[in-house]
Regions:
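Hot-dog-fold acyl-thioester-processing enzymes
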Residues: 2-103, 155, 166-187
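A general secondary-structure signal for short beta-strands and their flanking turns/coil
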Residues: 33-35, 118, 137-139, 154-156
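Basic side chains
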Residues: 40, 108, 158-159
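Residues that cap or initiate secondary-structure elements
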Residues: 42, 113, 129, 150, ...
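Short flexible/disordered coil segments
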Residues: 101-103, 128-135, 158-168
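Hydrophobic beta-sheet segments that form the core/acyl-binding groove
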Residues: 104-148
Length: 187
């Protein structure tokens, strides 16, 4: 039999090891810095697809002949893609248990990204506070930076989001077979 644990998920059955399920409001401490674990090498196809998907018609992103005549010499990666990528990289540490994003502020793009750059990111918790209107969530503000393979910052912003409090996370659907199909292995 399983019983609820503090996160609002069910306790694992004997022999199961729970995976990472994300932070809850009480886990955020102002001053903590998270180096997000996954980098992404941006390909030309990533830039082309995102730019066309969002109907951005700037030649800076999609026309290599035009871009060859600019000071950069190559197409620049769409900055909205860079924002989405770095926000996505941060979710494992910041917002797996998000209730809602409240906003991105002070977005800065100090250095261009081009196809072939590998982007990494980190975030620092700036503040936490209880929500005045929703007792089941708290509000967290972070500063996030994305940087390339050379350590050059390519984007920075502040992000504010609501995240569930401990004991208030909605129950997760558990899709699993009735019995384990894994072979027995002695360790």
């Amino acid at each position: 039999m399983t019983k609820p644990v503090e996160t609002g998920t069910e306790a694992p059955e004997r022999g199961e090891v729970p995976g990472w399920s994300g932070r809850l409001f009480e886990d955020f401490v102002p001053g903590d810095v998270y180096y997000h674990p996954f980098g992404k090498t941006v390909g030309d196809a990533d830039n082309q697809q995102f730019t066309l998907l969002t109907q951005n018609v700037s030649k800076t992103h999609v026309d290599a002949n035009f871009a060859a005549g600019t000071e950069f010499g190559v197409p620049l990666v769409n900055s909205a893609y860079v924002l989405a990528l770095v926000t996505g990289q941060s979710t494992i540490d910041l917002s797996m248990n998000v209730f809602a994003n409240l906003g991105w502020d002070e977005v800065r793009l100090p250095h261009p990204v081009v196809a072939g750059d590998t982007i990494y990111s980190r975030s620092k918790v700036l503040s936490t506070r209880a929500s005045g209107s929703r007792p089941t969530v708290g509000i967290v503000t972070v500063a996030t930076e994305g940087y390339n393979q050379d350590g050059v910052v390519v984007i920075g912003y502040r992000r504010t989001f609501m995240v569930y409090r401990r004991g208030h996370l909605p129950p997760a659907a558990r899709n699993r077979p009735a019995e384990t199909s894994l072979p027995a292995v002695e360790l």
